[in-house]
Design a protein with these regions (language model features):
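PLP-dependent class I/II
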Residues: 1-190
Length: 190
């Protein structure tokens, strides 16, 4: 069982349940500092398992593919652990505010249905624009000043959805949602 727990500190509703401590050698945990300490894009994280053979093989794979992250990134993670252990909780509270804002705005738009996520920092609303694919809608939104991903980028079942990240300020989310609403009205001929 491979358990991806990179969003373990970004949970708004309920509690994160981890497989850590199960002592089951079939469990391999993947985690990241990139999400926890807003180091997105750095791709710095770790793997844990009680399975020594699996860890030996993954260590070899990691060594031959990437060797290690650069020194500056390693020192940044160390500084985060030593000096900013409360940062993830503060960041999570802010992301919850942003989540509530973007979901409220999206759900107030005709033809848009947005599930309220329990964690992470993305929403994946269903967006209905007759005669247009999610990619076409995403391109029109980009022309209107809003960056999002078409749901089809995440597989066939994603068609008809868009993915928005709420990693920007609440003011920028509000401006982005104003633009989104205007573009969707234009596309629907309203």
């Amino acid at each position: 069982l491979i358990t991806d727990e990179v969003y373990d500190r970004i949970v708004f509703d309920g509690e994160h349940v981890s497989f850590v401590g199960s002592d089951d050698e079939r469990v391999i945990l993947i985690n990241s500092f990139s999400k926890t300490f807003a180091m997105t894009g750095w791709r710095i994280g770790y793997i844990m398992s009680a399975n020594k053979e699996a860890m030996t093989q993954m260590t070899k794979l990691q060594y031959y593919i990437t060797a290690c992250s650069n020194d500056a990134m390693q020192y940044a993670v160390l500084a985060a652990f030593e000096n900013a252990n409360d940062y993830p909780d503060k960041m999570c509270a802010e992301f919850k505010e942003r989540r509530d804002l973007i979901c409220s705005r999206l759900n107030s738009m005709p033809g848009v249905q947005c599930h309220v996520p329990e964690g992470a920092f993305y929403v994946f609303p269903k967006v209905e624009v007759p005669g247009m694919s999610s990619e076409e809608v995403a391109i029109e939104l980009l022309k209107g000043g809003v960056l999002c991903s078409p749901g089809s980028a995440f597989g066939k079942s994603g068609e008809g959805h868009l993915r928005f990240a709420y990693t920007i300020s609440r003011n920028d989310i509000s401006r982005g949602m104003d633009k989104t609403e205007a573009v969707l009205k234009r596309l629907r001929g309203e």
